[in-house]
Curated annotation (Swiss-Prot):
Biased composition regions of type Acidic residues, renumbered to the chain: 548-558
Record-stated family: Belongs to the peptidase M14 family.
Name of the protein this chain belongs to: Inactive metallocarboxypeptidase ECM14
Biased amino acid composition, Polar residues: 170-179
Naturally occurring in which organism (per UniProt): Ajellomyces dermatitidis (strain ER-3 / ATCC MYA-2586) (Blastomyces dermatitidis)
Key word Transport present: no
Gene designation: ECM14
GO cellular component, one term: extracellular region
Glycosylation sites: N349
Role according to the record: Inactive carboxypeptidase that may play a role in cell wall organization and biogenesis.
Length: 592
């Protein structure tokens, strides 16, 4: 980046100042931070921190001119921060809720839990071959347990002991952001930190993500273009970044990879990870031979917020909102699940009469506005712009899984199953080698299987309908050979409320996974003598894992002391299900 002229540098800095003063998108499309809970953090601040765009501008100076940054007290380590209690609004919304993890061992148990969840309209957070996490009101717990077999009535533990506080802590905190003490750009002996620490030190609202994407397109016009996929139900733009260097007058179809996140609004780590991978590819172009060659042969489309309306809603009203925000036949139950509304094997009959279901796929295929917009854009690119989509990564959370087609059923065998499995295993390996985080690999259809301790593995029923998924539509209807859904961190300690300290480590894991995908797509074309593994090691510095996968977690500060006063005595845990049994692997939530 040092080849920029002095005039170019001044232009970039002027652009950063301009963007900080004039929003790139209308206020209607990108509303500001919610007044609560963020404003509460600032009440006791003696000195306001610099604005985000000011810090971004400063980071450009550091990066381009090599000026060491001022000292910053980044979150983490031994630094102690003031404790703030969740405001009354969050207490009112979430204090009566609990997240329970059920351990499942038989098909009958799964079937009973599925039926009970449907009857009570419960919010299933995540499920694997061993457990299911469900959020419900505490006063509904007796009704749920009463519908379950005796073996399940005590086979559960609470995951998050203080849901309002955990929700509150997931929002950015101005009091926890490093302050500059008015020192500006004084030299420091501290080694230069990565510019990513500024944008990726916290989750960002849509009002920041949009201008940030525009800034990247303005700074790197040679290989970055800001595009629009379409409009949401509420009229917001669905922005995307096209990253690549397309040769002029090339008659061959342009091979293109789509990486998207935010289909489910509450899954903030997916949004941040899409942005992180985009930033990493953009800023590494010209510095790494593999990445430069990759972007000359492939375009990457990064869509961080496929569901902008729902994402804004999680910032302004309900942090745990999942669907989009369009109207349904029931005015008090808005929203369509954007991963259950796609046209291939749409299974709306499963939830068609229940718009209140969290997995409601609409009353017809492509009922979800944003999914319909993305499908139309993909069709237009294929038919009118000579684009060939070759890979699709759909980032979700949580449970740490790499899933491949098909989702709707296990009966059909994907024609390239062997290649799908091989690449999926490579993706999981890359993630494990980055930060020692383990991801399981399976077909998205598999649902639940019996414990591996048993000789025979039986396929269990699934907790929710899996027809109409984006994963299957891209694979079958578009012909994308490598279509995957990645369910990111964690495995339940925080669920959708993953602490901000996980943003960069998760981003690095998925960036390395994308590099494995790139190597798979490129093959040996022009890289016979290149050591990819050495190149990855050069580009990445592995972080220590924030959340360890081990089963040896120690109890800390009473975090394992659960309040079970709301559970009827007859349903309280007994010795039939040992929490420390092999395979249970419940990791306790830790204080930060």
């Amino acid at each position: 980046m040092r080849q920029f002229t002095h005039g170019t540098l001044l232009a970039i800095l002027a652009l950063a100042n301009t963007i900080s003063a004039i929003p790139s998108f209308s206020a209607n499309n990108y509303p500001a931070h919610p007044a609560e809970p963020l404003a509460l953090f600032a009440q006791s601040q003696p000195q306001a921190p610099l604005g985000l765009w000011t810090r971004l501008r400063n980071s450009v100076i550091e990066r381009l001119w090599g000026v060491p940054p001022q000292q910053r007290n980044h979150r983490g380590g031994n630094k102690q921060y003031p404790f703030y209690s969740a405001p009354a609004s969050l207490q009112a919304r979430y204090s009566d809720d609990v997240v329970l993890r059920f351990r499942l061992q038989t098909a009958d148990e799964v079937k009973a839990l599925v039926e009970a969840s449907n009857i009570l309209f419960l919010d299933v957070w995540a499920s694997t071959d061993e457990w299911v996490d469900i959020r419900l009101a505490k006063d509904v717990v007796p009704s749920l347990l009463g519908l379950l077999p005796k073996s399940l009535q005590t086979a559960h533990v609470p995951l998050i002991h203080d849901l309002p506080q955990t929700v509150y802590e997931s929002y950015p905190s101005s009091s926890q952001r490093p302050t500059d003490n008015g020192r500006g750009f004084l030299p420091s002996r501290e080694s230069s930190s990565d510019v990513t620490n500024i944008f990726f030190e916290d989750y960002q609202p849509l009002s920041v993500i949009g201008p940030w994407m525009r800034l990247l397109a303005s700074m790197f016009p040679s290989h970055v273009q800001l595009i629009s996929i379409g409009s949401s139900f509420e009229g917001r733009d669905i922005p995307a970044l096209r990253v690549g260097v397309r040769p002029a007058n090339d008659p061959k179809p342009r091979k293109t990879v789509i990486i998207g996140g935010g289909s489910h609004a509450r899954e903030w780590i997916g949004v941040s990870t899409v942005n992180y991978v985009a930033y990493s590819l953009i800023t590494t172009y010209g510095k790494s031979t593999p990445i430069s060659t990759l972007l000359e042969q492939f375009d990457f489309i990064f869509i961080p917020t496929i569901n902008p309306d729902g994402y804004v809603h999680t910032w302004e009203t309900d942090r745990l909102w999942r669907k989009n925000r369009q109207e349904t036949s029931l005015p008090f139950c808005p929203g369509v699940d954007l991963d259950r509304t796609w046209g291939f094997e749409w299974n709306g009959n499963a939830t068609g009469d229940n718009p209140c279901s969290e997995s409601y796929g609409g009353d017809e295929p492509f009922a979800g506005t944003e999914a319909r917009q993305l499908a139309g854009w993909v069709k237009e690119q294929t038919e009118q712009h000579n684009v060939k989509f070759v890979a699709y990564l759909d980032l979700h959370s949580y449970s740490q899984q790499v899933l491949y087609p098909y989702s709707y059923s296990c009966l059909p065998r994907p024609p390239n199953l062997e290649n799908l499995e091989e690449l999926a295993m490579g993706i999981a390996k890359a993630i494990r080698l980055t930060n020692r985080q383990s991801y399981t690999v399976s077909s998205a259809c598999q649902g639940f299987t019996a414990s591996q301790k048993k000789v025979k593995l039986d396929t269990f029923p699934r907790m929710e309908s899996t027809g109409g998924s984006a994963l299957d539509w891209f694979y079958n209807d578009v012909g994308v050979k490598y279509s995957y859904q990645l369910k990111l961190r964690d495995k339940g300690s925080y669920g959708f409320l993953l602490p901000r300290e996980n943003i960069v480590p998760t981003g690095k894991e998925v960036f390395n996974a994308v590099m494995v995908l790139a190597k798979f797509l490129l093959g040996s074309d022009g890289f016979e003598g290149l050591n990819w593994e050495a190149e990855f090691q050069r580009l990445n510095e592995a972080d220590k894992p924030i959340l360890d996968d081990g089963d040896d977690d120690e109890e800390e500060d009473g975090q394992d002391k659960k309040d079970d006063s709301w559970i009827p005595d007859e349903y309280k845990n007994d010795n039939d299900h040992d929490d420390d049994d092999d395979g249970w692997g419940l990791r306790r939530r830790r204080k930060r």
